[in-house]
């Protein structure tokens, strides 16, 4: 009896033998190819086989750096503004337009999880009775860190701007410091690309403090934060000797962070997809294989059922 055992199935109680180059062996090979290759094509062609991006949620570790730049517009003219910042070089450039405000800030950890949840910021700008504020531009600088996947450290800002035709007494803003991603973060490692100051406080040049240039350089970054309050509240009717007040609440919400999955995560998802489709093919082609051999579609030598001997019987047979 030539050949090797090609197929057996517990339900059939028969073994089928044939030569390695027989039609049955070729059919078996073809069935194997049809079982294992198409699931790969199906998984691949149905998109999302290789995981390109993934997401997770994390509340960032945000701290106000006690750095800010403030410009209050007092009229329509080009030089009618008052300004102050925490950068001495900027303040030196302002000369008589420099006006030091009174600041109070408080960061609050509302749920006691060790991460700050919001910043209460209040700025009181003393004004002469003849001065009026018609616009506010404010940059607050934060240190912003993510730890769950890659360690991402950056200095970022909240920019608040409001103009009104009516002189104001107070500007009230309340919003989120939202993460804005133009690029996926890494899944591991340390990323300090943007751990650079938003405002170059050591520069003596006025152009480095031009809001237009600061915003342009900041927006060039692939990862930024934006302050989301699109509708701050402008209050009018300031008393003659009262300061102009900026009152802002800046929240640090939990963010959905998009990242580039690592090698093993990519392989895992590809494997899960492949195997789940493969199971269906294994079942279907298992049936086909059984049919082909049971019905002798290709010539094979069926070997009659070898009934398992009971241990007692086999023991007795070996007795001398
Ligand atoms: C980020 O920058 C700050 C200030 O320049 C520095 O103190 C800190 O060590 C830097 N962090 C990392 C991880 O490089
Ligand atoms: C800040 O400005 C100074 C002077 O122009 C320059 O030498 C320095 O490289 C700048 N720093 C950054 C971080 O751009
Ligand atoms: C920003 O993202 C673009 C496109 O994803 C990339 O080509 C560029 O290198 C990134 N810039 C930095 C500084 O990482």
Curated annotation (Swiss-Prot):
Keywords: Cell membrane, Cell projection, Cilium, Cilium biogenesis/degradation, Glycoprotein, Membrane, Transmembrane, Transmembrane helix
GO aspect biological process, one term: camera-type eye development
Membrane topology classification: Multi-pass membrane protein
Residues carrying covalently attached carbohydrate according to the record: 195, 200, 222
Domain of life: Eukaryota
InterPro entries, alphabetized: TMEM231
GO cellular component terms listed in the entry, alphabetical order: ciliary membrane; ciliary transition zone; MKS complex
Membrane-spanning ranges: 23-43, 266-286
Record's subcellular location: Cell projection, Cilium membrane
UniProt subunit comment: Part of the tectonic-like complex (also named B9 complex).
Family of the protein in this entry: Belongs to the TMEM231 family.
Family annotation (PANTHER family): CHST5 PROTEIN, TRANSMEMBRANE PROTEIN 231
Function: Transmembrane component of the tectonic-like complex, a complex localized at the transition zone of primary cilia and acting as a barrier that prevents diffusion of transmembrane proteins between the cilia and plasma membranes. Required for ciliogenesis and sonic hedgehog/SHH signaling.
Protein name: Transmembrane protein 231
Gene responsible for this protein: TMEM231
């Amino acid at each position: 009896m030539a050949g090797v055992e090609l197929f057996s199935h517990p339900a059939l109680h028969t073994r089928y033998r044939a030569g390695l180059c027989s039609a049955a062996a070729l059919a078996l090979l073809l069935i194997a190819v049809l079982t294992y290759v198409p699931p790969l094509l199906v998984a691949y062609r149905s998109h999302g086989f290789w995981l390109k991006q993934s997401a997770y949620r994390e509340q960032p570790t945000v701290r106000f750096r006690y750095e800010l730049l403030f410009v209050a517009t007092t009229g329509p003219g080009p030089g009618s503004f008052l300004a102050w910042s925490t950068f001495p070089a900027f303040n030196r450039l302002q000369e008589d337009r420099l006006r030091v405000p009174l600041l109070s800030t408080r960061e609050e950890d509302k749920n006691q999880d060790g991460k700050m949840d919001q910043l209460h910021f209040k700025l009181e700008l003393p004004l002469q009775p003849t001065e009026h504020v018609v616009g506010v531009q404010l940059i607050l600088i934060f240190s912003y860190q993510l730890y769950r996947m890659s360690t991402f450290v950056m200095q970022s800002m909240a920019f608040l701007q409001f103009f009104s035709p009516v002189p104001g007494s107070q500007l009230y803003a309340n919003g989120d410091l939202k993460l804005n991603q133009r690029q996926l973060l890494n899944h591991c490692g340390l990323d300090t690309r943007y751990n650079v100051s938003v405002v170059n406080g050591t520069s003596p040049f006025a152009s480095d403090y031009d809001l237009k240039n600061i915003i342009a350089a900041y927006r060039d970054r692939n990862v930024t934060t934006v302050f989301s309050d699109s509708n701050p509240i402008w209050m009018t009717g300031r008393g003659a000797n009262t300061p102009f007040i900026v009152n802002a609440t800046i929240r640090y919400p939990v963010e959905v962070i998009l990242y580039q999955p690592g090698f093993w995560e990519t392989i895992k998802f590809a494997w899960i997809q492949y195997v789940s489709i493969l199971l269906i093919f294994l079942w279907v082609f298992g049936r086909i294989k059984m049919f082909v051999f049971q019905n002798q579609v290709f010539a094979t030598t069926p070997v009659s059922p070898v009934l398992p001997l009971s241990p007692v019987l086999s023991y007795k047979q070996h007795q001398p």
